[in-house]
Amino acid sequence: MKIDEFQGYLELDRSWQDSFLYPLSFQEYIYALAHDHGLNRTILLENAGYENKYNFLIVKRLIIRMYRQNQFILSTNDFQQNIFFASPQKIYSQVIAEVFSVIVEIPFSLRLLFSLEGKQIRKSHNLRSIHSIFPFLEDQFSHLNYVLDIRIPHPVHLEILVQTLRYWVKDAPSLHLLRFFLYESHNWNSFFSLKKNISFLKKRNQRFFLFLYNSHVCEYESIFFFICNQSSHLQSTFYGSLIERIHFYGKVEHLVKVFTKNFQVILWFFQDPLMHYVRYQGKSILASKATSLLINKWKYYLVNFWQCYFSVWSQPKRIYINQLSKNSLDFTGFLSSVCLNTSVVRSQMLENSFIMDNAINKFDTIVPSIPLIGSLSKAKFCNVLGHPISKPVWTDLSDSEIIDRFGXICRSISHYYSGSSKKTSLYRIKYILRLSCARTLARKHKSTVRSFLKRLGSEFLEEFFTEEEKVLSFLLPRDYSISQRLYRGRIWYLDIFCIHDFANHEWLVMRLSK
């Protein structure tokens, strides 16, 4: 690989990096734009800007103070007494963080527009939608052998993120402003002290930190994809000359004996293994049909790659090798596995008949009942064993509102996990929510669950049905076998746009139960 080609790839679409962004922080309309943008993203990020209020006077005072003082030369003693982060004026911190996140996204937006106009979108960028994950799992996983379950490492030093953005933004004052907020922010430790994945963020300055993390991952993936594409175009060695060479050295040295059955194993090192890369939140997978030896090489290559290119320390235990035929993969809230589905086929030719065993790999997705029950337990819908309990906090609400809340949680979970091939665990989750709702209503009216269910009848259960179940029960009320077969079919619904909540069970239940 030539150095100039590698540098040329890194400089691709960076023609907007010389833009001066810092003067925009002194423009009042940028603050209004950031505030409106935050309100529009409330559904996705649950962050309605800075306290849902746009105060023109606060913005005016902030810009005047930024003109008068140099806030980026700070001593240790002055750090806690800075005007941006003094106790009565913490809103300045949030205002500037919102504005900075809008300003610094400009080079990336211009780069996207430039790519669309010039039609320079690369193939690796075509399928970046979260909804493309599910068809990929269903179509490709049954043909793969190994999966690298990867937890993407985070930078151990704040300067690494600043260095990453320097490729795109060469505006020194903007980078100084970024350093200032990174070292000040109290959210930084909570953002990168991750237990399992990047799914838990504080509401304050959420968009700011989300942009920083995405820019870091984007830079890592751009270099990684380039190296993978270069390795996939390596020419394979012609097997005939390889066999003759091995035989020659075996005869001369008298040290090894080469058998024909070993040739195919050797040739794997000269063939394209057809790697598949999927990332979601702080977790990614690298799937392949390669051998165990080659997948181990990829594992240690990733560790060295992060250390050499990004100065990020990553331990090999953060990358787990999963053999799909033996273990399940926990990804996007599903337990995915590949099982061997055998079927007996009887074939008859003239007077002779043959019985053949036909084995087909089948992709299975299972609803993870234990994590979901644990999340329901933390949200006080059941105990740790999965026994439904009442929700005392909701007893002050009206009956219809209580039923609507329980029904919405049940329908959302059912809607997302409709792509599961085995829905036994899903039925148990529905049972917990239905009985918890009944016990909450019974507690409110000071009656028993049995008498309350008798009074409501089947109308109570219909509130927990999804729209698909209602349609099936209306169209096929008599043919039970057909309706059950249609309901048990695997259907991926692509109208779910907040999938990040569902991929994390605890975050999902806690969010919906508020």
UniProtKB/Swiss-Prot annotation:
Q: Which GO molecular-function terms appear in the entry?
A: RNA binding
| Superkingdom, taxonomy of origin | Eukaryota
* UniProt KW Zinc-finger keyword: no
Q: Note the SS bond partners.
A: none
Q: Where in the cell is it found?
A: Plastid, Chloroplast
Alphabetically sorted, this entry's keywords are:
Chloroplast, mRNA processing, Plastid, RNA-binding, tRNA processing
Q: Which GO terms describe its biological process?
A: mRNA processing; RNA splicing; tRNA processing
Q: Which InterPro entries match?
A: Domain_X, Maturase_MatK, Maturase_MatK_N
Pfam family of the protein (one): Intron_maturas2
Q: Which GO terms describe its cellular component?
A: chloroplast
Its predominant location is plastid
User: What does the record give as the function of this protein?
Assistant: Usually encoded in the trnK tRNA gene intron. Probably assists in splicing its own and other chloroplast group II introns.
Q: Which family does it belong to?
A: Belongs to the intron maturase 2 family. MatK subfamily.
Q: What is this protein called?
A: Maturase K
| Gene source species | Drosophyllum lusitanicum (Portuguese sundew)
Per the UniProt record, the lineage of the source organism begins with: Eukaryota, Viridiplantae, Streptophyta, Embryophyta, Tracheophyta
